[in-house]
């Protein structure tokens, strides 16, 4: 399967010090050897490879997501250059979804003029209201970042910027009330949002995750959020995780790495031009995301031929025996690949969130089946 989503890292530094960050605070520390900012030479090589791949496979629609670190640290000129370079390499008729994923702290009127001019959509990471958000997403000196992020979001929600609004990302903390968090996010009127499980694995379990007790704290949190979202009198926003589970239950295919068995269809390009697998693998071990290839010497098709990438396009065959025997495997898909890791055993075991995912899926399934039976769906 060709690559349809390219994550282009234009900055490897960040203006926040989030304590759950998989890039800076977990097992992999390769960021220390990366350039702080991407160069125009690397941008040119990266966008040329993207265009080459699009042409070779006759793709009609692709996404390029500008990432970091904090990508806005690269500055307005870098954004302008990247946008121009990406569009120059596109074959005629190809639709490009050019987005940036930011913590929102640096968003201001001047930046929005640039973003509007180059049609760069904006996703913002925010974890709920002030108390929820500032548990983790703080500045290096310890000050919370909520006020600055909220200020940027209010600008994003203004009429002249609204068409750029891609959505919100929220990392789950089970200490926070899920309904409070969801409703705090709704205050910014997002067109879409997603709840992300904090990165962890069997060798470094996520907070509050003990498989010995059989408890499912993350499922309970997500179930409360799901029920609040699902039972609203009208759809207040799209929630990707919930919609993907429903889509899979109804026989569809997944469009996210969190659930489902669809082949991986994205690649990361770091600030030095190196190709990498999904960034979340940095939570597993040093070098977990590396493939030893780069935009200067290798095509995107070469990345597709790498054994680690090929193994993630095998669907059910890439999973361990216990997953393949599971009744919800087509929905769960083994969960996020990074969450399956165990030191000395690799990635061929269930997700560290296995019990939570199973509980959540059964709950969503019961709700959807009841509505289908009653004719309310």
What are these regions (language model features)?
Residues 27-28, 332, 363:
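Short, non-ligating residues that shape and space the ligands of small metal-coordination modules
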Residues 16-21, 29-30, 130-134, 202-206, ...:
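Short acidic/His/Gly/Ser-rich catalytic and metal-binding motifs that mark active-site loops
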Residues 2-41:
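Canonical Radical SAM [4Fe-4S] cluster-binding loop centered on the CxxxCxxC motif
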